[in-house]
Structure formats: C-alpha cells, structure tokens
Amino acid sequence: MTNLRKTHPLMKIVNSSFIDLPAPSNISSWWNFGSLLGVCLIIQILTGLFLAMHYTSDTMTAFSSVTHICRDVNYGWLIRYLHANGASMFFICLFLHVGRGLYYGSYMYLETWNIGVLLLFAVMATAFMGYVLPWGQMSFWGATVITNLLSALPYIGSDLVEWIWGGFSVDKATLTRFFAFHFILPFIIAALAGVHLLFLHETGSNNPSGLCSDADKIPFHPYYTIKDILGVLLLILALTSLVLFSPDLLGDPDNYTLANPLNTPPHIKPEWYFLFAYAILRSIPNKLGGVLALVLSILVLAVVPFLHTSKQRSMMFRPFSQCLFWILVADLLTLTWIGGQPVEHPFIIIGQLASILYFLLILVIMPITSLFENNLLKW
C-alpha cells in the first residue's frame, strides 16, 4: 500500500515541503532562520489575536485599554510583552536571514529574493503601524513624522498625507485604519511567505559553498526538522528571557506617556529595528531626497542580483568580499547607533558618511572587488 502522506492531496503538499524535500547535506545553522521567521510570524499572529480581543482602537481609550490588558487581563502583560519583543526577535531573524542571503549569494534565485524584499517591506509596514497602536507619545509623534514624509512627493504629497490621516492630523481615523491594516497585513505576509517557499522549492536551497548540490541531497526529515526544532527552542529561550527579565529593554520610555499633540518629545525616534533607515533619512538635508534614500536603503536589495560580477556564487572562498561584507555589517550597526542619537555634531557627519558608505559598498565597491577577485584567480 502506498504511503498516505504521498497520496493524500493535502498531506502530499506538506510531505513535499517539509518531509521528503531533498535538501543539501551541508547547509549550516544560517539556514535555520527561515523556519524561525515562520515561528515568529505564528507567535505574532496568536499573541496579536488575543491582544485584539481586549484592545480598542479609539484615541480616547487606546492607551487605557493597553494598561487594562497589562493589569486586569489574565497573563495580559505576558501576551503584550511577547508581542512587543516578538517583533524585535522577528527583525533580528529577518536581518540575519537577509545577511545570510547576501553572504552566500542566495539572491541569485531571483523570484525568491524579490518576494523576500517585498516581505521585508510588508513586515516593516506592519511593525510601524503596530507601534502606533498603544497611543503613547512616541506612537503619536512617530506616526506624525513618518506619514508626514509623504508630503514631500510632488503634486500629490499633501493630499496623500491627509488621505492617509483621514483628516488634518493623526487622529481617531488614523488609529482605526492603522489597527485594521495591522490586523490584516500578517495574513498577507503569511501568504507571501507561502509563495516565497513555493519559488524556493522550484530551485532547491542554496548551500554555503554556492555549488550545485544535486549529487548530494538528504531528506529534510529527520535531519533538518530536528535542527530547526533546536533553533526554535533557542529562539523561545531568548524571547522568554527578554520578556520575563527585561521586557522594556528595547522599548522607549516616552511610550508610557499618553499621546499629547501639544507636547513634542525631545527626541522622536522609531523602534531600534528602523534606526538604520531613519539615520539614512536624516542624513540628507532635503526632505524629498531623504524619503527617496529611506526607500532606496531597502529597495537597493532588489538590485543586488544584477550587480553580482563574481564567477563564484558564495563569498565562502572570496576573502576580499568577506571583508567588505563585514564592513557593511559594521556600517549598518553604526547607522543604527546614529539613528538613536540627537541631530547634532558629531553625529550628523558620522551619519552622512555611514549612509554614503552603505550605498557605495553595495552599488560600487563590492561589484568592483568581485571583478578584481576574478582576475586574481585568472578567470
């Protein structure tokens, strides 16, 4: 008798994706982050669902409804902090996942990579709108500053901003629609992740060497299911440690103050995972230029496959490119630090230099270095 998992219409899909999937025998722990992102998404959807049962998206009651969740709902504080810090874990996994793709040349799978870039935008949009919902000072002013950037667009800018706000400022209409979008977007992300996997399974996984691994495949289960479970346990350990020991470590104290349109906080800044893009935005004195740089800081990832000049796919055997990759990582950490600093000397010039270096590395220096490495190997 044929195995049910290979014949049943539904089980067949699961089987070909997670059980009998042929996987390269040498993929390292850097390939764990896909499954970790899936777990993060499930955690966020579940905790978000329970939060939505008690949350009210009205400017008069939003802040107190979050307080009510933390004080009066059974384990409400736990659900709230799991959701808030789960977002941080989500972004840590995302950045490591993208970094892995850049290092090992996974971007050569064009469809998978481009859907990944789209997913990154969708997750960032979701996180931004989620940050507005508690209706604290940083929620309100963050929403005001970031949505106001759209007014830099020629002709349609100011109309577009008022259309998004649903009025002449960030108010009840804005909060209500942000809540609606924040609720629906994770399901769109889940669907996109399904398409991401679909395209990945068309080609099969890349591996650290960047070479074709068709001659040496092993079944996904039990080898990589066990490996993924270990990764998930470590993720849950990190998340629960953060939630139970230092839940406010990554938050902003200003968000424990009720939103007040008449009182501007001294330093308006987004959550830590947006600080690198925020630093790039601030480093350009022109409003429209800043907005373009902000969008391009993420969109530049879509151009990376077309700038691949090396004869080798992975950076595993390319020491010069490796060096530049780690300079890029250091540059992004510098930008993250600068994004959280006030706009004053010497932070302004450091931010501008780091922003220029970021784009130069990706668009110019790395492709030229790859050509140089080809010549070194007489290819």
Curated annotation (Swiss-Prot):
SUPFAM superfamilies in the cross-refs: a domain/subunit of cytochrome bc1 complex (Ubiquinol-cytochrome c reductase), Transmembrane di-heme cytochromes
GO cellular component: mitochondrial inner membrane; respiratory chain complex III
Single GO MF annotation: metal ion binding
Binding sites annotated in the UniProt record for a ubiquinone: H201
Membrane topology term: Multi-pass membrane protein
TM stretches of this protein: 33-53, 77-98, 113-133, 178-198, 226-246, 288-308, 320-340, 347-367
InterPro entries with a match to the protein in the record: Cyt_b/b6_C, Cyt_b/b6_C_sf, Cyt_b/b6_N, Cytb/b6-like_sf, Cytochrome_b, Cytochrome_b_C_euk/bac, Cytochrome_b_N_euk/bac, Di-haem_cyt_TM
Binding site for heme b b566: H97, H196
Subcellular location: Mitochondrion inner membrane
Positions contributing to heme b b562 binding: H83, H182
Cofactor: heme b
GO biological process: mitochondrial electron transport, ubiquinol to cytochrome c
Keyword Heme: yes
UniProt remark on cofactor binding: Binds 2 heme b groups non-covalently.
Keywords associated with the record: Electron transport, Heme, Iron, Membrane, Metal-binding, Mitochondrion, Mitochondrion inner membrane, Respiratory chain, Transmembrane, Transmembrane helix, Transport, Ubiquinone
Function, as annotated: Component of the ubiquinol-cytochrome c reductase complex (complex III or cytochrome b-c1 complex) that is part of the mitochondrial respiratory chain. The b-c1 complex mediates electron transfer from ubiquinol to cytochrome c. Contributes to the generation of a proton gradient across the mitochondrial membrane that is then used for ATP synthesis.
Other comments on record: Heme 1 (or BL or b562) is low-potential and absorbs at about 562 nm, and heme 2 (or BH or b566) is high-potential and absorbs at about 566 nm.
PANTHER family hit by this protein: CYTOCHROME B
Known partners and oligomeric status: The cytochrome bc1 complex contains 11 subunits: 3 respiratory subunits (MT-CYB, CYC1 and UQCRFS1), 2 core proteins (UQCRC1 and UQCRC2) and 6 low-molecular weight proteins (UQCRH/QCR6, UQCRB/QCR7, UQCRQ/QCR8, UQCR10/QCR9, UQCR11/QCR10 and a cleavage product of UQCRFS1). This cytochrome bc1 complex then forms a dimer.
Family (UniProt): Belongs to the cytochrome b family.
Name recorded for this polypeptide: Cytochrome b
Gene source species: Sorex unguiculatus
